[in-house]
Amino acid sequence: MQKKAELYRGKAKTVYTTESSDYLILEFRNDTSALDGQRIEQFDRKGMVNNKFNYFIMNKLEEAGIPTQMERLLSDNEVLVKKLDMVPVECVIRNRAAGSLVKRLGIEEGTVLNPPIFDLFLKDDARHDPMVNESYCETFGWVSKENLAEMKRLSYKANDVLSELFDKAGLILVDFKLEFGLFNGKVVLGDEFSPDGSRLWDKNTLDKMDKDRFRQSLGGLIEAYEEVARRIGVSLD
């Protein structure tokens, strides 16, 4: 399958059409952004690492019964996916307090959240992805009540699968975001799962192994991403 026209250019990925109206090609770039795209830098190998990381994770989720848009890996930084009608709301699961939750509520970073928190955010960079709830989704027609319930169920199921995967690799899955869409009317997991959209800490040292290394200018971003990939069994060569 060959890529045709550029359909959309995001902060770290470019989406291309193909000869089929049902499929797209995602190209993972080396760009890394923070502050809603106001700060952007490039890191060698990042596109390759995130592409293979995402492919690995999506396959794990498929094996667990979570439908994803993933079709097949095309190259080091490209993957073929189903074309979804994307829901304009992203789901966030929080197992420990970090990021915006700490700022918003003054909770100590690292506090265990039991049960895990499920948050919703409208995908709108210009408004800094405002937090919303189920009522907003229904009132504004962003997603039906039934499909939102399925998104929530799949988010928690993904959390169970991935928390165990990372725990066995000596890592804590602190939080992560998921994006869903519809394919032939069915809720399907789209976009990506990588250290760009999740928080991962080393279990012993609590070192941050995700994009917070870039946000907080800690250094060693790609080294951390590659270490996480190595621990969970992603082949990067």
Curated annotation (Swiss-Prot):
It comes from the Bacteria. Its EC number is 6.3.2.6. One of its GO terms (cellular component) is cytosol. InterPro entries: SAICAR_synt/ADE2_N, SAICAR_synt_PurC, SAICAR_synth, SAICAR_synthetase, SAICAR_synthetase_CS. Disulfide bonds: none annotated. Keywords: ATP-binding, Ligase, Nucleotide-binding, Purine biosynthesis. It catalyses: 5-amino-1-(5-phospho-D-ribosyl)imidazole-4-carboxylate + L-aspartate + ATP = (2S)-2-[5-amino-1-(5-phospho-beta-D-ribosyl)imidazole-4-carboxamido]succinate + ADP + phosphate + 2 H(+). One of its GO terms (molecular function) is phosphoribosylaminoimidazolesuccinocarboxamide synthase activity. Gene3D superfamilies: ATP-grasp fold, B domain (3.30.470.20), Phosphorylase Kinase, domain 1 (3.30.200.20). Pfam families: SAICAR_synt. Pathway: Purine metabolism; IMP biosynthesis via de novo pathway; 5-amino-1-(5-phospho-D-ribosyl)imidazole-4-carboxamide from 5-amino-1-(5-phospho-D-ribosyl)imidazole-4-carboxylate: step 1/2. One of its GO terms (biological process) is 'de novo' IMP biosynthetic process. Belongs to the SAICAR synthetase family. This is Phosphoribosylaminoimidazole-succinocarboxamide synthase. It comes from Proteus mirabilis (strain HI4320).
